[in-house]
Design a protein with these regions (language model features):
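Extracytoplasmic "Venus flytrap"
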Residues: 33-50, 71-76
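Short, polar/charged alpha-helical segment
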Residues: 42-67, 177, 181-184
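Immediate post-signal peptide segment of exported/extracytoplasmic ligand-binding proteins
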Residues: 22-37, 50, 57-65, 159-171
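N-terminal glycine-rich cofactor-binding segment that shapes the pocket for flavin-like pterin cofactors
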Residues: 30, 72, 76-77, 90, ...
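Contiguous mixed-secondary-structure segments that line small-molecule binding/active-site clefts
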Residues: 54, 80-86, 91, 96-184
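N-terminal secretory signal peptides and thylakoid transit peptides that target proteins
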Residues: 1-15
């Protein structure tokens, strides 16, 4: 998610960067602050966030740069990330809407386990759903991407979960309000 001020700066920089080589040389460098709770050694950070930032920097000819802050390095909690983008403290965040129980109620369904079999198809459905039915939940920012991890995996230390029966006897912490309700 990105706040509208940053989107405007990025859009202007991108428009200038694509107009001509001569103009590109004169275009100002835009530096965007990217903040997330993901650890810098995590797969999501290395293979998605960092890779995306590197690609944007390269394709913009170095005119769009990033200050990257994984692992909540700028302070706050994961619950506060959305407000940090909304309030202009940072330009781009990556977070889980389910971390903020009740704030984005219409998209919480996309975090339920056993609801999907293909992360790519479900991520596309998530995007279309938000654009069509839930855009007002994110009205203070410009959503850049939405994704799910497939297929709604439940993580444990030593037991694979294939069905509800596999949960018997386990102590489980739910990542969001609907999942915690289902587990209760």
């Amino acid at each position: 998610m990105i706040n509208r001020r940053s989107l405007l700066k990025t859009g202007v920089a991108a428009a200038v960067a694509t107009s001509s080589v001569a103009t590109l040389a004169l275009a100002p460098v835009v530096t965007l602050k990217f903040h997330t709770f993901m650890a810098p050694q995590s797969n999501v950070w290395l293979n998605m966030h960092k890779a995306w930032m590197d690609k944007v920097e390269k394709e913009s000819g170095g005119r769009i740069k990033f200050e990257a802050y994984p692992a909540m390095q700028l302070g706050g909690t994961p619950v506060q990330l959305y407000d940090q983008a909304k309030d202009g403290v940072v330009d781009i965040i990556w977070t889980l809407p389910g971390n903020t129980a009740g704030r984005f109620p219409r998209v919480e369904v996309f975090e339920l386990p056993f609801m999907m079999s293909n992360a790519e198809a479900t991520s596309k459905a998530y995007w279309e759903y938000v654009q069509t039915f839930a855009a007002d939940e994110f009205k203070d920012v410009q959503v850049l991407a939405l994704q799910v991890h497939g297929p709604g995996v439940i993580h444990t230390t030593d037991k694979l979960i294939h069905s509800v029966d596999d949960l018997k006897g386990l102590k489980i912490r739910g990542p969001s309000r609907p999942i915690t309700t289902l587990l209760a």
